């Protein structure tokens, strides 16, 4: 759990619980892959609305603090308006540790997993297991069961069958 002081920004940060509309956005994203196993989220509003998974006991402590934190719990994604002016929840990889994944995932072997975590796309022959139910985005696992990223499936291209959208090695490449 990370609780820190408020960042100096041009606008005021606001910490609050998620609204029912925001929770619905989070729930809809989780349902593309399985079942959400966590129910308590908070929002830190600044330039974007950052979503954090917290538990109720932590939230009760935060409510009593004289200074509001700029982050708390586990950062799981951001809610923002897309190019079509539609409000969406954009999850990060950590979000999926809160989802019981049952669909829209691929399992890669060791070599393909390594290449995926270096930003490479995945050919169809490197996919050991595929559970795809129509979603364009799929979760990528290594053969040990670790989530290593998020990809976009391209059924028309066997060489770039899964396009790398986000992976756990991204942070190290910055």
Swiss-Prot record:
A Gene Ontology molecular function term for this protein is: RNA binding
Q: Which residues form a coiled coil?
A: none
**Pfam families recorded for this chain?**
pre-PUA_NIP7, UPF0113
According to UniProt, the name of this protein is UPF0113 protein PH0281
Q: Spell out the family assignment given in the record's similarity comment.
A: Belongs to the UPF0113 family.
InterPro entries hit by this protein: NIP7_N, PUA_sf, UPF0113_PUA
Instruction: Note the CDD domains from the entry.
Output: Nip7_N_arch, PUA_Nip7-like
Q: Please, which domain of life does this record's source organism belong to? A: Archaea
């Amino acid at each position: 759990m990370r609780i820190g002081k408020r960042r100096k920004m041009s606008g005021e940060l606001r910490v609050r619980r998620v609204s029912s509309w925001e929770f619905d956005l989070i729930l809809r994203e989780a349902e593309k892959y399985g079942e959400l196993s966590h129910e308590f989220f908070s929002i830190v509003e600044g330039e974007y609305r950052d979503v954090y998974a917290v538990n109720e006991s932590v939230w009760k402590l935060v409510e009593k603090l004289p200074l509001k934190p700029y982050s708390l719990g586990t950062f799981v994604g951001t809610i923002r308006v897309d190019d079509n002016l539609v409000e969406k929840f954009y999850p990060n990889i950590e979000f999926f540790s809160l989802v019981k994944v049952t669909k829209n995932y691929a399992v890669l072997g060791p070599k393909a997993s390594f290449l995926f975590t270096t930003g490479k796309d995945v050919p169809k022959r490197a996919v050991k297991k595929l559970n795809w139910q129509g979603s364009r985005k799929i979760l990528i696992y290594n053969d040990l069961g670790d989530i290593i990223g998020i990809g976009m499936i391209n059924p028309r291209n066997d060489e770039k069958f899964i396009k790398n959208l986000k992976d756990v090695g991204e942070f190290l490449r910055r």
